[in-house]
């Protein structure tokens, strides 16, 4: 599945706004993930998962930075996220379904933070983009 030129333009355009709030968006997305899907906490037994904790903020920042890497390499997302895919598949052994859960939580966060920008067209583009990201992150599982 690949993005159309229009979808790519939407992603890159919105990213300019998102990147200015990356840390906050990452933290909020993880808080939403852990609240909505508490089973995902099992991958972070060594983290303080209280809302706003330093570890949660740091990991949220990493998550959004990885999304940013995918945006910057929108024509080669696989290349941009290959090492991250290996890490999650071989070392962390994260269940692939969690990427979809995280993607959904990011979509909700973006919709809440950017209601004027998050039109139906933008929602569809971000959903497709995050599906591509999730697919790339699960490539090494096969």
Swiss-Prot record:
<dbReference type="InterPro" id="IPR050056">
    <property type="entry name" value="Hemoglobin_oxygen_transport"/>
</dbReference>
<feature type="binding site" description="distal binding residue">
    <location>
        <position position="59"/>
    </location>
    <ligand>
        <name>heme b</name>
    </ligand>
</feature>
<keyword id="KW-0007">Acetylation</keyword>
<comment type="subunit">
    <text>Heterotetramer of two zeta chains and beta-type chains.</text>
</comment>
<comment type="similarity">
    <text>Belongs to the globin family.</text>
</comment>
<keyword id="KW-0813">Transport</keyword>
<dbReference type="GO" id="GO:0098869">
    <property type="term" value="P:cellular oxidant detoxification"/>
</dbReference>
<dbReference type="GO" id="GO:0005344">
    <property type="term" value="F:oxygen carrier activity"/>
</dbReference>
<keyword id="KW-0597">Phosphoprotein</keyword>
<dbReference type="InterPro" id="IPR002338">
    <property type="entry name" value="Hemoglobin_a-typ"/>
</dbReference>
<dbReference type="InterPro" id="IPR012292">
    <property type="entry name" value="Globin/Proto"/>
</dbReference>
<dbReference type="GO" id="GO:0031838">
    <property type="term" value="C:haptoglobin-hemoglobin complex"/>
</dbReference>
<feature type="modified residue" description="Phosphoserine">
    <location>
        <position position="82"/>
    </location>
</feature>
<dbReference type="GO" id="GO:0020037">
    <property type="term" value="F:heme binding"/>
</dbReference>
<comment type="function">
    <text>The zeta chain is an alpha-type chain of mammalian embryonic hemoglobin.</text>
</comment>
<protein>
    <recommendedName>
        <fullName>Hemoglobin subunit zeta</fullName>
    </recommendedName>
</protein>
<feature type="modified residue" description="Phosphoserine">
    <location>
        <position position="73"/>
    </location>
</feature>
<dbReference type="InterPro" id="IPR002340">
    <property type="entry name" value="Hemoglobin_zeta"/>
</dbReference>
<keyword id="KW-0479">Metal-binding</keyword>
<dbReference type="GO" id="GO:0042744">
    <property type="term" value="P:hydrogen peroxide catabolic process"/>
</dbReference>
<keyword id="KW-0561">Oxygen transport</keyword>
<feature type="domain" description="Globin">
    <location>
        <begin position="2"/>
        <end position="142"/>
    </location>
</feature>
<dbReference type="GO" id="GO:0005506">
    <property type="term" value="F:iron ion binding"/>
</dbReference>
<feature type="modified residue" description="Phosphothreonine">
    <location>
        <position position="29"/>
    </location>
</feature>
<feature type="modified residue" description="Phosphoserine">
    <location>
        <position position="53"/>
    </location>
</feature>
<feature type="binding site" description="proximal binding residue">
    <location>
        <position position="88"/>
    </location>
    <ligand>
        <name>heme b</name>
    </ligand>
</feature>
<dbReference type="InterPro" id="IPR009050">
    <property type="entry name" value="Globin-like_sf"/>
</dbReference>
<keyword id="KW-0408">Iron</keyword>
<dbReference type="GO" id="GO:0005833">
    <property type="term" value="C:hemoglobin complex"/>
</dbReference>
<dbReference type="Pfam" id="PF00042">
    <property type="entry name" value="Globin"/>
</dbReference>
<keyword id="KW-0349">Heme</keyword>
<dbReference type="InterPro" id="IPR000971">
    <property type="entry name" value="Globin"/>
</dbReference>
<dbReference type="GO" id="GO:0019825">
    <property type="term" value="F:oxygen binding"/>
</dbReference>
<feature type="modified residue" description="N-acetylserine">
    <location>
        <position position="2"/>
    </location>
</feature>
């Amino acid at each position: 599945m690949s993005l159309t030129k229009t979808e790519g333009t939407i992603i890159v355009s919105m990213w300019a706004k998102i990147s200015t709030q990356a840390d906050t968006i990452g933290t909020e997305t993880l808080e939403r993930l852990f609240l909505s899907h508490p089973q995902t906490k099992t991958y972070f037994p060594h983290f303080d998962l209280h809302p706003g904790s330093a570890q949660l903020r740091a990991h949220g920042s990493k998550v959004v930075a990885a999304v940013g890497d995918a945006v910057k390499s929108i024509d080669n997302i696989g290349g941009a996220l290959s090492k991250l895919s290996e890490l999650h598949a071989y070392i962390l052994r994260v269940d692939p379904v969690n990427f979809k859960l995280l993607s959904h939580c990011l979509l909700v966060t973006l919709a809440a933070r950017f209601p004027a920008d998050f039109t139906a067209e933008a929602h569809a583009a971000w959903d497709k983009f995050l599906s591509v990201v999730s697919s790339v992150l699960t490539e090494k599982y096969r």
